[in-house]
């Protein structure tokens, strides 16, 4: 059984893995980013930090999009969305719906994209979780989403 210090330490190590993973994304080293995020996810799972696990899983989906692996991205998004539903995190659901909508949009599936963007807006408007921690997650998601959009524009 882990004590509070061990859980805190494990949580911090997971956060550090994520910070380095985002740096890997900046360097376009997506394989390394995936490895680091998976390490962070394993650590979070071991201490039962469900919400952060779902947030990082959503980020892993974004990195898979950068690697053009839509099926793995959707797997991550759907698991993250299901977890967000279970823990009743409207802010996290908004983030996931937004990412799914972006994926659908890039595939030209505009009707599905619009539905997801509407769900994202509705969830965010109803969220009471607009805390600093949520803001940090939105900043990470936003940064990686910009990287994805830049990549798709360059490929067009």
Which positions does each model-derived feature cover?
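Amphipathic alpha-helical segments of tetratricopeptide repeats
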Residues: 2-3, 39-43, 81-85, 89, ...
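Eukaryotic all-alpha helical interaction scaffolds
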Residues: 24, 44, 64, 84, ...
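Residue signature of alpha-solenoid helical repeat architecture, marking inter-repeat boundaries
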Residues: 8-12, 51, 91, 132
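Residue register of alpha-helical TPR repeats
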Residues: 15, 55, 95, 135-136
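TPR/TPR-like alpha-solenoid signature
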Residues: 11, 18-19, 58, 98, ...
């Amino acid at each position: 059984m882990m004590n509070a210090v061990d859980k805190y330490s494990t949580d911090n190590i997971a956060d550090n893995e994520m910070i380095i993973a985002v740096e890997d994304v900046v360097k376009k080293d997506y394989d390394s980013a995936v490895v680091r995020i998976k390490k962070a996810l394993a650590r979070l799972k071991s201490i039962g930090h469900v919400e952060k696990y779902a947030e990082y899983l959503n980020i892993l989906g974004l990195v898979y999009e950068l690697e053009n692996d839509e099926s793995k991205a959707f797997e991550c998004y759907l698991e993250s969305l299901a977890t967000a539903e279970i823990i009743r995190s409207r802010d996290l659901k908004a983030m996931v719906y937004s990412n799914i909508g972006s994926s659908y949009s890039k595939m030209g599936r505009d009707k599905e994209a619009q539905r997801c963007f509407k769900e994202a807006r509705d969830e965010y408007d109803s969220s009471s979780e607009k805390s600093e921690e949520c803001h940090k997650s939105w900043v990470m998601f936003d940064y990686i989403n910009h990287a994805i959009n830049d990549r798709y524009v360059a490929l067009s």
